[in-house]
């Protein structure tokens, strides 16, 4: 069983990495935040549910804030201009072997690996072209 622990969400080679820490595990939903201010935090939630008698369902959500500095009464304060959201629902049959689910995890990591078409489209704010 996975333990709730901190992890590096954004790896910038050690300079300015974003690490999220566990803050909650209520009602089957685990939650991680990058800092104490929810409005300025990177946020990850994950849940696990049985889906029928033969499936397991994982729901993972990610919030990525755009941090800005605002001046209020002459004082500079950090804030969030907007947030980007991602949501992944993953359903796995209960008869999937350890090797099978390892391949699924690696496939998810590969989707967003720098240099792959999906990561390139997101980072260039464009679509997919032949």
Curated annotation (Swiss-Prot):
Alphabetized Pfam families for the sequence: Levi_coat
Keyword Protein transport annotated: no
Subcellular location: Virion
Region (Viral RNA-binding): 31-104
Keywords from the named record: Capsid protein, RNA-binding, T=3 icosahedral capsid protein, Translation regulation, Virion
Gene3D superfamilies reported for this sequence: MS2 Viral Coat Protein
Domain of life: Viruses
One GO MF term attached to the UniProt entry: structural molecule activity
A GO cellular component entry from the record: T=3 icosahedral viral capsid
One GO-annotated biological process of the protein: regulation of translation
Function (record text): Capsid protein self-assembles to form an icosahedral capsid with a T=3 symmetry, about 26 nm in diameter, and consisting of 89 capsid proteins dimers (178 capsid proteins). Involved in viral genome encapsidation through the interaction between a capsid protein dimer and the multiple packaging signals present in the RNA genome. The capsid also contains 1 copy of the A2 maturation protein.
Family: Belongs to the Leviviricetes capsid protein family.
Assembly behavior: Homodimer. The capsid proteins form dimers that assemble by group of 5. Twelve such pentamers are linked together with free dimers. The homodimers binds to the viral RNA via an operator hairpin, but also to many other RNA sequences in the viral genome; this interaction probably shifts the virus from the replicative to the assembly phase and ensures specific encapsidation of the viral genome.
Protein name, per record: Capsid protein
Species assigned in the record: Enterobacteria phage GA
